């Protein structure tokens, strides 16, 4: 159940500015309260205009129903005040204002604005309440995307204010200026707000960073972002912005550290984010970590099982010299691809594990699929695999294919001569026997 403060009393009607929870803005009730002058002078209220007992009871009943979220019931006693001639203009103004708070609780900001403006138009509200409603209206119009109107109301609020404003109104005006692309004015106000605040606020830091980053003032943004990730380590946006700033300064190591921090905190969840993180681990010579990111991501269904991702996983295992582990992703990549390169890589993993027959089969499939960058190299490997399985005639055929290419001819014919010598020695041994 929502707890709505009784902002109407018999003694005075000094409503706090509408909370961010109501208007959908980033400036909540606590900020709005700080917007009031720190040492307010006595408001120029009309002492004769106070709520009578009947009006007070009806408004109090409306507040009770509002707290219970019984909105239709909450309107009834207020409407009764408006329709009766027994109530004063002041009491009717209070009823209209209260209707605005009910509309706000319902999320109907257009009607909230209409009620507040209608209440102001009566001319019967205390000066302090007029100030608060004006501030609320500035927030509401901003939430509705009407920056110009919001700015006009806030400037009106500043002009009527007695004393020194606190930080929040400057931050609100900075947000308005930012939405209007008036970056210079936004920066001036947000720096004033931050200077007045006891501690930096996340939303205000966001506004200042937006001003700086839009102007490519990355050097100025860097210390602010470094402070932000320490204060609010769970905010992904700050880490992303800091990473970009590090890259702009060609500080790849710190950018990598920032991205690791996001990964460790579980901020990377999409297939693209996780596969990119794996590529970074691979780039920074941590291949086994790259493989772990990809393998766990695929197993959990977070990383898409595409040809490209299987290739990256296999590459990570191969760089880590985990030949056996690379076989499964290479097999999957080979099935998905229309090129023979993955079967060739699969064969290389089998060769490292001395699985000659499996290597031979994979190389034959690689040549069958084709589209190889250097088929002569594949023929050479196939010849070697066949030698290891003592298929000498088939090996010679493969080496002759490899010999058609100048780059592999020397090695190919050296293998052929080696096979011929071995076969000759075997024949001699048999004849001697």
Positions of PLM-derived features:
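Generic helix N-cap/helix-start motif at coil->alpha-helix transitions
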Residues: 51-60, 89-96, 126-136, 162-172, ...
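Residue-level recognition of tetratricopeptide repeat
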Residues: 63, 101, 139, 175, ...
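Alpha-helical adaptor scaffolds
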Residues: 307-321, 327-376
């Amino acid at each position: 159940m929502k707890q709505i403060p009784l902002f109407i009393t018999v003694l005075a009607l000094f409503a706090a500015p509408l909370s961010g929870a109501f208007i959908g803005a980033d400036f909540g009730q606590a900020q709005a309260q700080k917007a009031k002058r720190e040492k307010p002078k006595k408001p120029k209220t009309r002492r004769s205009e106070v709520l009578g007992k009947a009006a007070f009871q009806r408004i109090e009943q409306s507040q009770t129903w509002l707290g219970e979220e019984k909105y239709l019931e909450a309107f009834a006693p207020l409407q009764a005040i408006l329709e009766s001639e027994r109530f004063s203009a002041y009491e009717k103004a209070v009823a209209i204002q209260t209707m605005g708070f009910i509309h706000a609780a319902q999320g109907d900001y257009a009607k909230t604005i209409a009620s507040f403006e209608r209440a102001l138009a009566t001319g019967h509200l205390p000066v302090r309440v007029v100030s608060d409603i004006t501030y609320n209206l500035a927030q509401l119009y901003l939430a509705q995307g009407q920056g110009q109107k919001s700015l006009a109301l806030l400037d009106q609020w500043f002009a009527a204010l007695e004393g020194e404003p606190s930080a929040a109104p400057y931050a609100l005006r900075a947000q308005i200026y930012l939405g209007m692309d008036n970056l210079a004015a936004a920066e001036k106000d947000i720096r004033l707000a931050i200077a007045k605040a006891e501690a930096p606020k996340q939303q205000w830091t966001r506004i200042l960073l937006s001003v700086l980053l839009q102007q490519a003032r990355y050097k100025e943004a860097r210390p602010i972002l470094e402070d932000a990730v320490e204060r609010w380590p769970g905010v992904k946006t700050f880490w992303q912005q800091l990473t970009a700033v590090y890259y702009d300064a060609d500080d790849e190591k710190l950018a990598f550290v920032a991205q690791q921090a996001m990964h460790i905190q579980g901020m990377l969840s999409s297939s693209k984010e996780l596969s990119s993180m794996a590529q970074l681990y691979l780039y920074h010579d941590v291949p086994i970590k790259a493989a772990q990111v990809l393998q766990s991501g695929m197993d959990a269904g977070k990383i898409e099982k595409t040809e490209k991702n299987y290739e990256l996983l296999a590459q990570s295992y191969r760089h880590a010299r985990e030949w056996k582990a690379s076989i499964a992703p290479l097999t999957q990549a080979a099935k998905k691809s229309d090129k023979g390169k993955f079967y060739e890589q699969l064969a290389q993993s089998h060769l490292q594990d001395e699985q000659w027959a499996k290597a031979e089969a994979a190389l034959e499939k690689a040549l069958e699929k084709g589209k190889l960058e250097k088929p002569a190299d594949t023929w050479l490997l196939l010849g070697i695999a066949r030698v290891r399985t003592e298929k000498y005639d088939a090996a010679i055929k493969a080496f002759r294919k490899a010999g058609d290419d100048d780059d592999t001819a020397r090695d190919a014919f050296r293998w052929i001569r080696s096979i011929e010598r071995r076969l000759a020695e075997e024949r001699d041994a048999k004849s001697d026997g």
